């Protein structure tokens, strides 16, 4: 399949093991191909009746799934992972068409997706409580039990991967899931739903409900939704938290960031430059944990900046389905204009643009209406500038200089966000000392933006709470029951 040829021809809701049109609507949305600006779908946003049907369907599947053994759930997840591997290129192409990231990156996203399913398949078969001996031969034990119907709300930057990150632990624990993709990227979650069905999951175990804010509200406030896991912006996360609070629902929030990347003078310069590029330009800079505040020790600032600019200018921008493309378009026209606005604001506030920050028109005429820009490096930045304080969510790196470790730690932590942070240094004591002081949920030492499924991922402060990936996520998709067993006579005060 080539850029500019795909059009959605099937329903985008998935309920009861099949694609369906919603029985009612709360408006419509359009989905676009970012590379060309071409509309690929107009779809109905699910109304309250459709949400109710999806929840009832998921409840029925939950009754079946929650009674299966961990080994039986493991087998379904492993089969789903196998199918994802088998359909790797197909899924990656769909992701690239609807999201705009390069096919090179999209394939890596698919790989981390099947790895996630395999990891939680292993945990599904090993979930257990504990036995506690009590006086007189009595004892207690704990059971880790599923919550019920869980709601996953995805973001548009990693549509398929996020659907896997949320559904794999939920299903491993014995839950059912309803997944609402971002209306910007409605396509690839349907592929995952079909894969779960083909792998042997009960019909309704993973339903996909399309829609915007109104659909999300129907889902969050539904009495039979037991848990909400959301990836997205801080303002939307606050609204979801308010809605979930009214139903006393547990939630996981993975929100925005303005992460610091600290480059000490004793670093391996080659690796530090690579790390800075990874921290800023993956998925066109549209990554919540990006290290967009790059603090460079003064002794190496000039050399580091020169090399970062040189390598940034070499990044191949263009058709995201071509193998040599490393940067595709941003998600849509309003977001492109927003990011370009941050660059204009930075210049007005005194920052210097060393490269990029401009709209880009690829040579291929079919891409002329795509949402492209050149990756941008800003220098002469100060901590009070808008480009340094606010999440841009685009390919814009702000370089700042520092002199001492104590100084940079204070500045790095001076933010309401706390999703990630990074440090490059050859001093292993300093590396661990700095990581301990950084106020962030994930700290990278001598690397950046790696996400092994074995490691928990989540934020501090306004970047959210709860975790995705790692063994600990089982605790966020289950509840603990304590059983107390008396082996003797009851001693009573009455």
Swiss-Prot record:
Keyword field: Acetylation, Cytoplasm, NAD, Oxidoreductase
Protein origin, superkingdom: Eukaryota
Catalytic activity: 4-(trimethylamino)butanal + NAD(+) + H2O = 4-(trimethylamino)butanoate + NADH + 2 H(+); an aldehyde + NAD(+) + H2O = a carboxylate + NADH + 2 H(+); 4-aminobutanal + NAD(+) + H2O = 4-aminobutanoate + NADH + 2 H(+); formaldehyde + NAD(+) + H2O = formate + NADH + 2 H(+)
Modified residues (N6-acetyllysine): 30, 298
The protein's name: 4-trimethylaminobutyraldehyde dehydrogenase
Gene3D superfamilies membership: Aldehyde Dehydrogenase, Chain A, domain 1 (3.40.605.10), Aldehyde Dehydrogenase, Chain A, domain 2 (3.40.309.10)
Subcellular location: Cytoplasm, Cytosol; Cytoplasm
Name of a matching Pfam family: Aldedh
Subunit composition and interactions: Homotetramer.
Annotated positions of the N6-succinyllysine modification: 30, 59
Tissue: Detected in lever (at protein level).
Job of this protein: Converts gamma-trimethylaminobutyraldehyde into gamma-butyrobetaine with high efficiency (in vitro). Can catalyze the irreversible oxidation of a broad range of aldehydes to the corresponding acids in an NAD-dependent reaction, but with low efficiency. Catalyzes the oxidation of aldehydes arising from biogenic amines and polyamines.
Residues annotated as binding NAD(+): 180, 232-236, 391
Sites of N-acetylserine modification: 2
EC number of this enzyme: 1.2.1.47, 1.2.1.3, 1.2.1.46, 1.2.1.19
Gene Ontology MF, one: acetaldehyde dehydrogenase (NAD+) activity
Family: Belongs to the aldehyde dehydrogenase family.
Pathway(s) the chain acts in: Amine and polyamine biosynthesis; carnitine biosynthesis
First-listed, main subcellular location of the protein, grouped into a coarse class: cytoplasm
The encoding gene: Aldh9a1
Upper taxonomic lineage: Eukaryota, Metazoa, Chordata, Craniata, Vertebrata
Active-site residues per Swiss-Prot or TrEMBL entry: 254 (proton acceptor), 288 (nucleophile)
GO cellular component: cytoplasm; cytosol
Biological process terms in GO annotation: aldehyde metabolic process; carnitine biosynthetic process; carnitine metabolic process; kidney development; liver development; protein homotetramerization
InterPro entries: Ald_DH/histidinol_DH, Ald_DH_C, Ald_DH_CS_CYS, Ald_DH_CS_GLU, Ald_DH_N, Aldehyde_DH_dom
